[in-house]
Amino acid sequence: MKLWAHRGCSQRYPENTLLAFEKAAQLQGLAGIELDIQLTKDGQIVVIHDEKVDRTTDGSGWVRDYTLAELKRLKIDAGCYPHQVIPTMEEVFELLEERLKAGAEAESGTGAGAESGTETGTAAGTDTGSKTGSKPGKMAGLRLNIELKNSILPYDGMEEKIIDMVHDRGLEGAVVYSTFWARSLEKIHYLDPEAELGILDTRISDCMYKLKGGCGATALHPFWRAMDLPAEQLRGYTVRAWMSGHLYPEKSTGTRLKMEWLEELGITDLILNEPEVYLG
């Protein structure tokens, strides 16, 4: 089972912030980080889940009605940590680029053995080389699941912008694109036929319906409690299930899921708010 950080380590730290992503990147054996993107009024890609800023910042209103400079003035409460702001996608790439490039090399088979989602590495995310044959100190690979938040409010040109950004940094192999909107995946597939795509929905049967419709997806991204297809029907597919549940500053329930049971349902990857419970 590969584990991904849902909006970073979003149970203990504010979701979709550089702080949450930095904490996630420190986890030994983490496969990747999931995040959400939207466009500002002036066409900049920012990382935020909700279409409005009300829940996660001290502001109010639609993300699309703010310029980047205006969004940067909004504060995100981070408790005892320095206050956070809504990050741009460029800032996230700058933070994680070295790890993502190692992940891209691992996916393409050109790296020196760095591999995400394994039991190698240290708490700081470096590979000791003891199990993969890589050189001591090599950064362990990390991948990024970029969800385009365009199923409620379509953002014209967001697909082109994010693909260009990923290609400019040479991170194609480190990125999975996902969205609830099948047409957006079709567009990404047209723009970048080699891109890895995941189709989102609540029930896995609805994910499969969209996939069969020709959206170009190779992975199914259902809610983990909505596995309404038999595991036999899911063989050969990447099933990257997502969780909701508690987010910062809510208290953790401390519940640990039984991974063997989830694998029996056909789930191959799990995107969760508190990956540190399993990997820390």
What kind of feature is each model-predicted range?
Residues M1-T110, T122-G280:
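Phosphate-group recognition and catalysis centered on beta-loop-alpha active-site segments
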